[in-house]
Amino acid sequence: KSTELLIRKLPFQRLVREIAQDFKTDLRFQSHAVLALQEAAEAYLVGLFEDTNLCAIHAKRVTIMPKDIQLARRIRGERA
């Protein structure tokens, strides 16, 4: 478990700007703000995939499936 970022910075930054554009145009981001968003997003995704993998293992599978992600999110209380 390293602390290095898993997603390249520029593609993530473009994604953040693209999503933000839907809410307000001409937004500017400090580099530290984008980095904080990326660290939070990656931490969330890593945790979700860890839980998803546990769901697949519980079902006696080694391959994760969409239903594993759905179950993990439901157990976490993220989706009713």
Swiss-Prot record:
The terms describing its cellular component in GO are: nucleosome; nucleus
One Pfam family from the UniProt entry?
Answer: Histone
SUPFAM superfamilies from the UniProt entry: Histone-fold
Q: Where would you find this protein in the cell?
A: Nucleus; Chromosome
Coiled-coil annotated residue ranges, if any: none
Read off the InterPro entries from this record. Answer: Histone-fold (IPR009072), Histone_H2A/H2B/H3 (IPR007125), Histone_H3/CENP-A (IPR000164)
GO molecular function terms attached to this record: DNA binding; protein heterodimerization activity; structural constituent of chromatin
Question: Which parts pass through the membrane?
Answer: none
Q: Which UniProt keywords apply?
A: Chromosome, DNA-binding, Nucleosome core, Nucleus
* Domain of life of the native organism: Eukaryota
What Gene3D superfamilies is this protein classified in?
Histone, subunit A (1.10.20.10)
Q: According to its UniProt record, which protein family does this protein belong to?
A: Belongs to the histone H3 family.
Subunit note: The nucleosome is a histone octamer containing two molecules each of H2A, H2B, H3 and H4 assembled in one H3-H4 heterotetramer and two H2A-H2B heterodimers. The octamer wraps approximately 147 bp of DNA.
Described function: Variant histone H3 which replaces conventional H3 in a wide range of nucleosomes in active genes. Constitutes the predominant form of histone H3 in non-dividing cells and is incorporated into chromatin independently of DNA synthesis. Deposited at sites of nucleosomal displacement throughout transcribed genes, suggesting that it represents an epigenetic imprint of transcriptionally active chromatin. Nucleosomes wrap and compact DNA into chromatin, limiting DNA accessibility to the cellular machineries which require DNA as a template.
Q: What is this protein called?
A: Histone H3.3
Species, as recorded: Hordeum vulgare (Barley)
